[in-house]
Design a protein with these regions (language model features):
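Short, ordered loop/turn segments at secondary-structure junctions
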Residues: 69-71, 79, 108-109, 134-137, ...
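Glycine-rich phosphate/diphosphate-binding loop of Rossmann-like nucleotide-binding domains
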Residues: 74, 79-99, 151, 157, ...
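N-terminal ligand-binding/catalytic initiation module
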Residues: 1-153, 375, 381, 385-389
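Rossmann-like adenosine-cofactor binding region
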Residues: 232-301, 307-309
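Solvent-exposed alpha-helices and their adjacent loops that cap or buttress functional pockets
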Residues: 55-60, 96-97, 122-124, 148-149, ...
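Adenosine-phosphate binding glycine-rich loop
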Residues: 158-159, 178, 282-390
Length: 390
């Protein structure tokens, strides 16, 4: 199927993928007077008296803003807000179709962090949560961290944490397959950008103790003096053995390779230098860091990619619909590490001991159990950690 042609036809024939649908009918004068003036004044008064009533009288409780400035859209790069709109519409569709969550795409003409932060704060009263999307690094770090501190609704950068949660879920099961423990394995991550950094943080939360991050210049270590602040931080908290060099040096004896970088960077020969029962997650799209057959030829036992045409697809759609569904259901003020880890285990635990195998470590994107399982786990963790209003 020619997906490019099909996508153009879909978008043009429907003039986009989302629209506003009224929940009520306005067929009579009474309907009009109830839905709008004069009747609408009463819920306005109630909300004025008690701002929390906005969740009872409006769509806020199930509405997420999908916010982007179009500076890091898929593999297209900085294409601007207008060109990024089809992606944000698509994200809104996935929220609704997979999680029953209403979402509205908002593409803003704002390039610096301060402008994006100001825009999000200005629109926050309308929404129960904000999903940040396709905002370039390093600005995305400052934007998310600031909004998390200054807003009382959940803010979630899916490119970072959605990826991290699903990777963690997949690795939990991959380690179960090979009989290793998170706290014992040596993990190498290639590509410590936004997603890579979040993956490292999530794996550390899950118990990983020996992680090495590798960028285009080599391993990150204490005093590596990177031009990027987050990489200096990674150098301080990872690489406990202070291994210096490149990917070759980092991979020697490694149990796990996680790639969020570029095609072809991992070779069969490099895989042969890894530990027995090696695990490789090659998630560069559309062409991974190594193809599955090449990895298997190098002795890799469990392989995952970001592609749907290979087993073990690492796909963010397993996370964000259910995650926001759970957070919104308890009116969470935040999405904290405990909620993220709960989501990862909820995804992983859907694969039973009987079904788990080298080629089945994570549910498929259309598994109907996923969103509900994630939502329940996230809501429970929110209550247990004190960020839930309900």
């Amino acid at each position: 199927m020619d997906y490019n042609k099909a996508a153009l036809e879909m978008h043009e024939s429907h003039h986009g993928k989302v629209g506003i649908v009224s929940k009520v009918e306005v067929k009579t004068r009474d309907d009009l007077s109830t839905a709008y003036t004069p009747g609408v004044a009463e819920p306005c008064r109630k909300i004025k008296e008690n701002p929390e009533d906005v969740y009872n009288y409006t769509f806020k409780g199930n509405m997420v803003a999908v916010v982007s400035n179009g500076t890091a859209v898929l593999g297209l790069g900085d294409i601007g807000p207008e060109a990024g709109l089809p992606v944000m519409e698509g994200k809104a569709v996935l929220f609704k179709e997979f999680g029953g969550v209403d979402a509205f795409p908002i593409c803003i003409d704002a390039h610096d962090a301060a402008s994006v932060i100001a825009a999000c704060k200005a629109i926050a009263p309308t929404f129960g949560g904000i999903n940040l999307e396709d905002i370039k690094s390093p600005e995305c770090f400052e934007i998310e961290e600031t909004l998390e501190k200054e807003l009382d609704i959940p803010v979630f950068h899916d490119d970072q944490h959605g990826t991290a949660i699903v990777v963690t879920a997949a690795l939990i099961n991959a380690l179960r397959v090979v009989g290793k423990k998170m706290e014992d394995v040596h993990i190498v991550l290639n590509g410590p950008g936004a997603a890579g950094t979040a993956i490292i943080k999530m794996l550390m939360t899950a118990g990983a103790k020996d992680i090495i991050a590798v960028d285009q210049f080599g391993t990150l270590y204490k005093g590596c003096n990177s031009a990027e602040a987050h990489k200096n931080w990674l150098g301080e908290v990872t690489n406990p053995r202070q291994i210096k060099g490149g990917l070759k040096e980092a991979l020697a004896g490694a149990d796990v390779f996680i790639g969020v970088s570029k095609p072809g960077i991992l070779t069969t020969e490099l895989c042969k230098t890894m530990n027995q029962d090696a695990i490789v997650f090659a998630m560069a799209n559309p062409t991974p860091e190594i193809m599955p057959d090449e990895a298997k030829a190098g002795g890799v036992r469990v392989m995952a990619t970001g592609r749907s045409d290979f087993p073990n697809q690492v796909n963010n759609v397993l996370c964000f619909p259910g995650l926001f569904k759970g957070a919104l259901s308890v009116r969470a003020r935040d999405i904290n590490n405990e909620m993220k880890l709960a989501a990862a285990y909820a995804i992983a635990d859907l694969i039973t001991d009987a079904d788990r195998s080298e080629e089945n470590i994570i549910p498929g994107a259309f598994d109907p159990r996923v969103a509900e399982a994630v939502a329940n786990a996230v809501a429970k963790a929110a209550r247990e950690t004190g960020v839930a209003r309900l």
